[in-house]
Amino acid sequence: MQFTPPFEQGVLLRRYKRFLTDIRLSDGSEVTIHCPNTGSMKNCLFPGEKVWFSTSDNPKRKYSRTWEQAESDVGHIIGINTGRANQLAEDAIKAGVITELSGYHSLKREVKYGSENSRIDILLSDDTGSTDTSFSGTPPTNTEPANTKAKPNCYVEVKSCTLLEEGQGYFPDAVTTRGQKHLRELMEMVESGHRGVLLFVVQHTGIDSVQAAAHIDPDYASLLTKAHSAGVEVIAYSAEMSPKGASLLKSCPVKL
């Protein structure tokens, strides 16, 4: 994923009211920008350190600038915009980086599914007759032999992981009833004969492994263990990030 134009740099002053952040620009002026992260952002807020932001030319926006990345007090880069995680995942699937999700013909985003009225982040299917053009004509990275049974549909729920504590990456950074619902929906898909995959997109260059934050949301941690035992696949991939672009490059261990 390339950022055009590249993100601009500022200095973090404060985050408040969840969606607002004050920064200092290179000319010394102070401005308020949009914070596209609904989580607690625990251990992601470092006043006085560098931040990077994008700028929209949409005149209807109250805040034209959006906080995208931050630098920690020890120099790690953190992806603040959780909305980037789904695109990073899609790009990596198309490029064949996420080997666990290769070989499908169709990729669709935000498809309704489940008994709790959710929308799956990514739906992969082996439907060669699909009108979906998400792969832009690119064949899957590993094709099935002719006349073999089609792959089961693969429901992929994407979560952005940015919480680093004592060298360990954790998800979530706050209690998430929505995340618990998504785990139940994935279990339901597995029970119906499909694949259910929880994909952690690690947007923190200091995180080397991921595990459920039982000390923050014990219900989520317990449900994740149950989901994994029920057949939900849990994987993580780490992002390389800069003001010019970002991409998922390598698998990251998940401690279950």
Swiss-Prot record:
GO molecular function: DNA binding
CDD domains: SfsA-like_bacterial (cd22359)
Family: Belongs to the SfsA family.
Gene3D superfamilies: 2.40.50.580, 3.40.1350.60
Gene name in the database record: sfsA
Listed name of the protein: Sugar fermentation stimulation protein homolog
Location of region: Disordered: 128-149
Stored HAMAP family: SfsA
Cross-referenced Pfam families: SfsA, SfsA_N
